[in-house]
C-alpha cells in the first residue's frame, strides 16, 4: 500500500484544479457575465485536469506547482472573460501577435496587471522544471506529441472535436461558452494551424499580376491634363455620435455644432468599419488599400509582409509626397513596417511630436493637428503634391481628460463610459473643426476625408448600447440592423471648395 503522503500528493492536482476552476468560473460569471455552460464543464475540467497532471509531473516543488497552475488557469479563464466583455469575443491564436502592442499601450497598474502574470508564469516554469521521475518523461512526451500533432496534423485534433462539439464561424463567444476555455483553446489552436495559408508560387503570382495589369492598362483611357490635388485623410479614434444612445440622458449634444452642421451637409454619411472597440489597424488597411479584412486578426501584424499597391504607393508613384502621423510608439500594430510597405515615405510617430498637451498618456488632437500643420507647411506652400494621413491618439478608453478640458456634458446613464465618452467627443469634434478651418485656409482645394475607425467601448457586454436598445448583450443575438449599427461610424469627404459630398454609407 502506498504511503499516505504519496496518495495525497497524487490527489493534489484534482483538488487544486477543482478549486481554481470554481474560483475563476465565479469571477468570470459574476464580474464579467461570462458563464461557461454547465454541459461544457465536465469535459473542459477533464482537459484542465490533464494539463494539471502534466504540469505536476514536471514540477520540482508542490507550492510552486499550485501557484503556477493558479496563474495559468486565471490567465486562461479570466483573460478570456475580459476580452469577451470588452470586444465581444474570446482570445484567438492570432492575439499572440498583438500581445506586444497591448503591452506597449498599457501604462501604470494596467501594464502591471497584464505583464506581471505572464512574467511570473515564465519565471516559475523555468524555476520549477524537473525531469527527475519517470512521470516527468511521460508528461514531456505528451506535450511534444500534442505539439507535433497540433502543428503538422491539426485535422487529427480538429475534425473529431468539430464533429462532437460543433463550431460556429460567426459566433466565437458561443463557441467559448459551449466548450469552456481549455477545450476552446485546443480547438481553435488546431484550427489556426489547419487554416494556415500556403503562399502562392512567386513566379505564378508575378505572371498573374502582369497579365492583370496588361489587361487593365489596355482598357484605360488617358486622363488628359491632370492637376494633382493634396489629399488629407484623418482617422478619428473611436469617433461616433453619442446621441444615438437615446437612454443616455445627455443634457446637451456632445458633438460640436459646427461638426454637426458639416456632417448634415454630407447627408450624415457613414463608413462601415471591420472592427469594434479596437483593432484600428484593420480599419486603416481597408481605407488605405481597398481590400476587406476577412480574418479575425490584426492585418498589420503578420499578414502584410511585402510591398502592396495601396493608395500611398500609387500616389507616390505619381509624384506625391506621402506622410503618416500617429503620436504613439512606432512599433504599435507593427505600423513602422506596415506603413512603409503600403507606400508611406515618412512616418512621424511619438518621438516626432512635442508632448505638450496630454490627456494622461494621449496627446491631444489639438496639439497633434497643430504640429502636423507646422510640418506640412513647407510642401503645401511649395505646391508639392501631398498625401497627408493622420491617425489621432486621443479618444482611447477610458476617455481621460486633463485639467484644461473640464467636463461639459452630463448623463443620467449608470454606465460610467457614457458620460466620459461624451465629454471626450465634445473636445474631439471641436478641435477637429478648428483644425479643418486652419487646413482649408492654407489648402482650400484639397480633398479631405474624416472618419471614425470604430464604435467606442461603452461598458462590459455592450452595456450602454443595451441600455438604449440599439444592441443586444451578445453578438449571437444581433439583428441585421444591429450589425449595421455595430459597424457604422461618421464619414465626411470634402471636395475642396465644392464642399462635402453626400456619399451615403461606404463599406
Feature-to-residue mapping (PLM):
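Alpha-helix initiation and N-capping motif
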Residues: 96-99, 179, 183-186, 206, ...
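Membrane-interface transmembrane-helix boundary segments in multi-pass integral membrane proteins
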Residues: 103-117, 178, 182-185, 417-425
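Membrane-interface segments at or immediately adjacent to transmembrane helices
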Residues: 152-233
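Short, well-ordered coil↔helix boundary/capping segments
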Residues: 65, 69, 93-96, 182-183, ...
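Transmembrane and membrane-interface helices of multi-pass
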Residues: 1-175
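Secondary-structure junction/capping motif
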Residues: 92, 160-188, 241, 280, ...
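A diffuse structural propensity rather than consistent per-protein peaks
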Residues: 85-92, 200-202, 310, 349, ...
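Solvent-exposed soluble domains appended to multi-pass membrane proteins
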Residues: 214-222, 226, 233-236, 241-507
Amino acid at each position: 500500500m502506498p504511503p499516505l503522503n504519496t496518495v495525497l500528493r497524487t490527489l493534489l492536482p484534482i483538488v487544486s484544479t477543482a478549486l481554481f476552476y470554481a474560483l475563476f468560473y465565479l469571477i468570470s460569471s459574476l464580474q464579467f457575465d461570462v458563464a461557461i455552460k454547465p454541459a461544457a464543464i465536465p469535459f473542459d475540467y477533464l482537459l484542465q485536469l490533464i494539463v494539471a497532471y502534466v504540469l505536476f509531473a514536471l514540477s520540482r516543488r508542490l507550492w510552486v506547482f499550485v501557484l503556477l497552475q493558479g496563474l495559468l488557469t486565471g490567465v486562461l479563464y479570466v483573460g478570456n472573460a475580459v476580452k469577451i466583455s470588452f470586444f465581444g469575443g474570446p482570445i484567438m491564436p492570432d492575439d499572440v501577435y498583438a500581445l506586444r502592442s497591448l503591452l506597449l499601450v498599457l501604462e501604470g497598474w494596467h501594464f502591471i496587471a497584464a505583464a506581471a502574470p505572464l512574467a511570473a508564469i515564465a519565471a516559475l516554469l523555468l524555476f520549477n522544471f524537473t525531469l527527475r521521475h519517470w512521470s516527468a518523461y511521460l508528461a514531456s512526451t505528451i506535450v511534444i506529441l500534442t505539439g507535433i500533432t497540433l502543428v503538422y496534423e491539426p485535422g487529427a485534433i480538429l475534425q473529431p472535436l468539430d464533429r462532437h462539439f460543433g463550431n460556429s464561424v460567426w459566433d466565437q463567444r458561443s463557441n467559448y461558452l459551449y466548450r469552456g476555455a481549455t477545450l476552446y483553446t485546443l480547438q481553435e489552436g488546431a484550427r489556426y494551424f489547419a487554416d494556415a495559408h500556403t503562399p502562392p508560387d512567386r513566379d505564378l503570382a508575378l505572371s498573374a499580376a502582369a497579365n492583370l495589369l496588361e489587361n487593365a492598362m489596355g482598357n484605360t483611357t488617358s486622363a488628359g491634363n491632370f492637376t494633382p490635388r493634396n489629399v488629407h485623410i484623418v482617422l478619428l479614434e473611436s469617433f461616433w455620435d453619442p446621441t444615438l444612445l437615446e437612454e443616455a440622458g445627455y443634457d446637451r449634444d456632445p458633438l460640436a455644432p459646427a461638426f454637426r452642421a458639416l456632417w448634415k451637409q454630407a447627408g450624415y454619411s457613414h463608413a462601415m468599419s471591420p472592427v469594434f472597440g479596437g483593432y484600428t489597424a484593420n480599419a486603416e488597411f481597408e481605407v488605405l488599400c481597398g481590400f476587406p479584412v476577412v480574418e479575425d486578426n490584426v492585418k498589420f501584424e503578420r499578414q502584410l509582409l511585402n510591398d502592396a499597391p495601396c493608395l500611398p504607393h500609387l500616389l507616390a508613384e505619381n509624384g506625391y509626397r506621402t506622410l503618416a502621423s500617429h503620436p504613439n510608439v512606432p512599433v504599435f500594430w507593427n505600423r513602422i513596417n506596415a506603413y512603409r510597405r503600403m507606400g508611406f515615405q515618412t512616418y512621424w510617430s511619438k518621438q516626432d511630436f512635442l508632448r505638450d498637451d496630454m490627456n494622461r498618456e494621449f496627446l491631444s488632437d489639438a496639439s497633434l493637428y497643430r504640429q502636423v500643420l507646422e510640418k506640412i507647411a513647407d510642401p503645401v506652400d511649395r505646391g508639392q503634391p501631398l498625401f497627408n494621413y493622420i491617425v489621432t491618439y486621443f479618444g482611447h478608453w477610458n476617455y481621460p481628460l486633463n485639467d484644461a478640458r473640464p467636463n461639459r456634458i452630463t448623463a443620467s446613464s449608470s454606465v460610467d463610459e457614457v458620460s466620459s465618452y461624451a465629454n471626450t467627443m465634445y473636445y474631439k469634434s471641436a478641435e477637429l473643426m478648428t483644425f479643418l478651418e486652419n487646413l482649408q485656409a492654407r489648402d482650400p482645394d484639397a480633398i479631405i476625408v474624416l472618419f471614425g475607425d470604430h464604435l467606442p467601448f461603452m461598458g462590459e457586454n455592450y452595456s450602454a448600447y443595451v441600455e438604449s436598445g440599439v444592441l443586444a448583450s451578445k453578438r449571437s443575438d444581433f439583428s441585421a440592423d444591429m450589425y449595421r449599427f455595430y459597424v457604422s461610424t461618421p464619414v465626411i469627404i470634402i471636395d475642396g471648395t465644392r464642399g462635402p459630398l453626400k456619399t451615403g454609407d461606404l463599406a
